[in-house]
């Protein structure tokens, strides 16, 4: 089991930390959907700039991939609008509608204590 943490960085849920458990041993990459629909994993119904099914974040065990699902207002990594599937690193900001989000690095992604400078 791997946990993926998504931090909401703006809007009425600013500061919320969402946890998703993934079972990568099933052979299927983990997927987290973003949109206004209640059945999306991250429901952003308060943001009128978010499409019903706006974007999907996929984790294949090594890389996070963000993909816009033909939304009206686009999906951005930083200030750059993405087209197609785009690799995104933990800690990097991305925007769905007007809502900024971030993938939080997991302790296993930070490396061992030997990598620390102190």
PLM regions and their residue ranges:
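Forkhead-associated
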Residues: 42, 53-93
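Short coil-to-beta-strand transition motifs
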Residues: 48-52
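Short, charged beta-turn/beta-strand-edge "cap" motif at the junction between a beta-strand
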Residues: 100-102, 107-108
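Gly/Ser/Thr-rich beta-alpha loop segments that engage phosphate groups in nucleotides
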Residues: 37, 76, 99
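Intrinsically disordered, low-complexity acidic Ser/Thr-rich regulatory segments
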Residues: 1-47, 58, 95, 108-118
């Amino acid at each position: 089991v791997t946990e993926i943490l998504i931090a909401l960085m703006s809007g009425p849920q600013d500061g919320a930390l969402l946890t998703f458990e993934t079972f990568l041993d099933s052979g299927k990459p983990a997927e987290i959907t973003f949109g206004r629909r209640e059945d999306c994993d991250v429901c952003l119904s308060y943001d009128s700039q978010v499409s019903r099914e706006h974007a999907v974040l996929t984790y294949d065990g090594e890389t996070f991939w963000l993909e816009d699902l033909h939304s009206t207002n686009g999906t951005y990594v930083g200030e750059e609008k993405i087209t197609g599937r785009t690799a995104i690193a933990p800690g990097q900001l991305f925007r769905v509608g007007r809502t900024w989000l971030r993938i939080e690095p997991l302790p296993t992604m930070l490396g061992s204590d030997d990598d620390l400078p102190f």
